[in-house]
Regions:
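Bacterial N-terminal signal peptides that target proteins for export
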Residues: 1-8
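Core hydrophobic alpha-helical membrane-spanning segments
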Residues: 12-13
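C-terminal motif of bacterial Sec signal peptides marking the signal peptidase cleavage site
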Residues: 17-20
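Conserved metal-phosphate-binding beta-hairpin within the catalytic cores
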Residues: 219
């Protein structure tokens, strides 16, 4: 176990060096064109991840493409990208690949979420994403808020895919399911689904991320570089 932890630490150091020196926006390097300093395109920093950017599509709880997602890419802080590379390597060694649903999220997109939540007549996606909640409860119960940690640039929504079957592991709920079944430790999911969540959690926490207890897919880098800054540049 100590050897594994040492190898992961070495890998993290190597990735941090590569990100910083490779023009990926880390300290000492220029950001990719169009990105603020300190941010990278995830597909360039961690090439083996699968991207399924839900807010660029209509396959999300709004039922439409979200404002300010102009292209289906994932943007993230350099530090979070380096840490994710460590988690990805850990999971790949176990036969899994990372699939990312969202990373950096513009404040303009969060504002779109708020407008949608305030339109109580729009319940197009209720049956799939929030079947047990009235829409007017999404704000009071904290599922929608006027600010998101994603806008600080070091939070990521993801799952894992079995490399042999090409299928996502069964986590018990879809991504962005509003309900207690999405919580870590929920008794509404079975033992296999709980075990699958723990595979993801162990890899992410081992790489320096912190789990959000109410969403199995949501992780934030501990010691994130911009803890008090909410960015609003578009995803392009």
């Amino acid at each position: 176990m100590k050897k594994i932890k040492l190898l992961l630490c070495v890998l993290l150091a190597v990735v941090l060096l590569a990100v910083g020196c490779g023009g990926q926006g880390g300290q000492g390097g220029e950001a990719p064109a169009g990105l603020p300093e300190g941010f990278v395109y995830l597909a360039e920093a961690v090439p083996d991840v699968i991207l399924e950017i839900r807010y660029y599509s209509s396959y999300n709880f709004l039922g439409t493409r979200v404002d300010d997602y102009l292209v289906p890419v994932a943007i993230i802080s350099s530090e979070a990208a380096a840490a994710l590379a460590v988690a990805e390597a850990n999971l790949r060694a176990q036969g899994y690949v990372v699939k990312v649903f969202d990373a950096y999220r513009p404040q303009g997109a969060v504002d779109h979420f708020v407008r949608w939540a305030e339109d109580h007549g729009d319940v197009l996606t209720k049956a799939y994403f929030y079947p047990d909640l009235a829409k007017d409860r999404l704000f009071p119960e904290g599922y929608i808020a006027e600010r998101s940690g994603h806008s600080r640039g070091s939070t990521i929504d993801l799952t894992i895919v079995d490399m042999q079957t090409g299928k996502e592991l069964d986590m018990g709920t879809p991504f962005d399911f509003f309900g207690t079944a999405s919580h870590h430790g929920s008794d509404l999911v079975d033992a296999e689904q709980t075990a699958n969540r723990l595979i993801l959690r162990a890899a992410m926490e081992g790489a320096g991320f912190v789990a959000y207890e109410e969403e199995w897919w949501h992780y934030t880098l501990a010691g994130e570089p911009y803890p008090d800054t909410y960015f609003d540049f578009v995803v392009r």
